[in-house]
């Protein structure tokens, strides 16, 4: 027997879900679509490795090792198979590298694998330079990832910036038309600007979900960025480049601001945006005495208009903004009953932030206006 282990289904499924987050789903080289199991270390521990070259995942988990060895199985097929099984003990064994048997109760399946030696040697984790609470990191990533540029040609804007310094820790994303920024109270002894590629964000969120009470340790070397949670390690290829000077576009003196209920504002935008011109997807925001009005109109779809009561006694204000950009922020701040909308003039960027100002971090969002027709 070349390989034989036994593991609880829940333990195995949790590891497979992490590996699936970076696995190539439809195409790619065999190494990108397979997962390596290695039980040669013994002591009831099995190591696991998956990679798509840009991101790599490595972990160890508890299992009964009946025959130490190494096998590589198709990641998605194994994950989907284990997911559908009832909770029980799962046995994985192989008498030859490309024929791996998986048993659970009365279920028995034969998987075709690949040679395990195609997987590179896993690099050891470096000493961390910074630690982040896993729940806070997950919340921060969800509040910034939607502002990452979807255009592959703008490779630096395809990344999220982790800006570490002795006075602040900031996570920033922008696509050139909007910017999301979260600032944490913790600070790093070392000043670093780390670019995290868009494709690594969801695997990193998955890692935070599996971290439990563990903090996420961040380590950096010349080629890769590593995030470690307990026995789990996510390694990301380092992106080189200069992120834009985001501080230059942060509004400073806005002059006027309005507090508005988050859910009523979101409802009004969602109701009216379906009537917006499909080329711009813009809604018009009009603020006047005690009223915030959201409207959209197009010759193709018609017109919609909704009003929200607010407290405002300043000069009237009218501007247009991309409806989806506004909705992204409002959905990400579902725990905040009110948001603060600050503005200067229709040609300047609007600043939005949660109205309560509480929590372990500050969250700012900046949106450029659209041209009014």
Spans of features found by a protein language model:
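Structural preference for solvent-exposed beta-strand-turn elements
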Residues: 1-373
């Amino acid at each position: 027997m070349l390989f034989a282990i036994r593991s609880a289904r829940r333990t195995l499924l949790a590891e497979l879900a992490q590996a699936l987050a970076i696995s190539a789903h439809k195409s790619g080289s065999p190494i990108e679509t397979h997962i390596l199991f290695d039980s040669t270390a013994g002591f009831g521990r099995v190591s696991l490795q998956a990679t798509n070259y840009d991101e790599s995942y490595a972990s160890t988990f508890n299992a009964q090792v009946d025959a130490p060895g190494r096998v590589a199985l198709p990641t998605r097929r194994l994950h989907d198979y284990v997911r559908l099984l009832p909770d029980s003990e799962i046995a994985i064994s192989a008498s030859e590298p490309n024929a791996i048997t998986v048993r659970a109760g009365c279920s028995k399946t034969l998987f075709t694998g690949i040679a395990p030696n195609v997987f590179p040697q896993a690099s050891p984790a470096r000493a961390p330079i910074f630690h982040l609470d896993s729940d806070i990191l997950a919340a921060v990533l969800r509040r910034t990832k939607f502002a990452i540029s979807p255009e592959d040609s703008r490779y630096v804007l395809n990344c999220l910036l982790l800006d570490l310094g002795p006075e602040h820790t900031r996570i920033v994303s922008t696509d050139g038309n909007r910017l999301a920024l979260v600032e944490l109270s913790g600070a790093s002894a070392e000043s670093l600007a780390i670019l995290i590629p868009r494709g690594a964000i969801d695997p990193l969120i998955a890692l935070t979900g599996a971290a439990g009470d563990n903090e996420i340790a961040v380590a950096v070397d010349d080629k890769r960025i590593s995030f470690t949670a307990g026995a789990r390690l996510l390694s990301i290829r380092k992106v080189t480049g200069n992120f834009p000077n985001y501080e230059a576009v942060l509004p400073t003196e806005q002059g006027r601001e309005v507090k508005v209920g988050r859910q009523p504002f979101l409802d009004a935008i969602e109701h009216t945006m379906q009537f917006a011109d499909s080329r711009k997807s813009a809604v018009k925001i009009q603020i006047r005495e005690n009223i915030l009005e959201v409207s959209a109109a197009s010759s193709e779809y018609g017109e919609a208009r909704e009003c929200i009561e607010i407290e405002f006694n300043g000069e009237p204000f009218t501007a247009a903004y991309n409806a989806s950009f506004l909705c992204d922020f409002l959905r990400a701040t579902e725990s905040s009953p009110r948001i603060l909308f600050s503005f200067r003039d229709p040609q300047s960027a609007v600043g939005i932030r949660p109205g309560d100002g509480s929590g372990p971090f500050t969250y700012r969002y900046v949106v450029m206006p659209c041209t009014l027709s």
